[in-house]
Amino acid sequence: MLERIKDSFTHSIQTKIDAAEALPESIEKAAEMMVQCLLGGNKILACGNGGSAGDAQHFSAELLNRYEIERPPLPAIALTTDTSTITAIGNDYSYDEIFSKQILALGQPGDILLAISTSGNSGNVIKAMEAALSRDMTIVALTGKDGGAMAGLMGTNDVEVRVPSNVTARIQEVHLLVIHCLCDNIDRTLFPQDDQA
């Protein structure tokens, strides 16, 4: 088991090295989109399932509270947190609509949807993207593997950050790092620091 544990660290490190080569430009573009969204008085909605739901909530918490610097709260909503709404929609309609119906109610032109799915094939996240597009929102998608069906929904103004891995755990680990990179870029662009390199 010790070797298996060490292998997990090694594979995680290698996936991050591969991601460091493949992803910086798309992360930078996504962060720039988010900055412009926030400067325009808009908000970021985030969704995902399981660990990706946790990532959506993590991102929202970093914006609403703070990441690493003291600054005013920034508008972000995780669509994964309201159990009454989620269970009502799931019960009365379908699980595939738990995010899309919220987006149709809350999303405005100029808002961004942060759509997170390791496979790119989560039905409710795909429906969320379709709803966001119908509301003239832009999309930042965090995916992995081959991008799945989500990759096919990306428009010219949208950004996909696709982790170069087929292993769900490794993709999730990089998604968290991507979220931290987005938060850091947003903070450092909107609120430059004297010690900024």
Swiss-Prot record:
List the PROSITE patterns.
SIS
Residue sites binding substrate per the record: N49, G50, G51, E62, N91, D92, S117, T118, S119, S122, Q172
The UniProt record gives the binding positions of Zn(2+) as H58, E62, Q172, H180
EC class name = isomerase
Keywords linked to the UniProt accession: Carbohydrate metabolism, Cytoplasm, Isomerase, Metal-binding, Zinc
Q: What GO molecular function terms would the record report?
A: carbohydrate derivative binding; D-sedoheptulose 7-phosphate isomerase activity; zinc ion binding
Q: Does the keyword field hold Transferase? A: no
Q: Could you share any additional remarks the record makes about this protein? A: The reaction produces a racemic mixture of D-glycero-alpha-D-manno-heptose 7-phosphate and D-glycero-beta-D-manno-heptose 7-phosphate.
User: What is the protein name for this chain?
Assistant: Phosphoheptose isomerase
- Species source reads Shewanella loihica (strain ATCC BAA-1088 / PV-4)
Q: Which gene encodes it?
A: gmhA
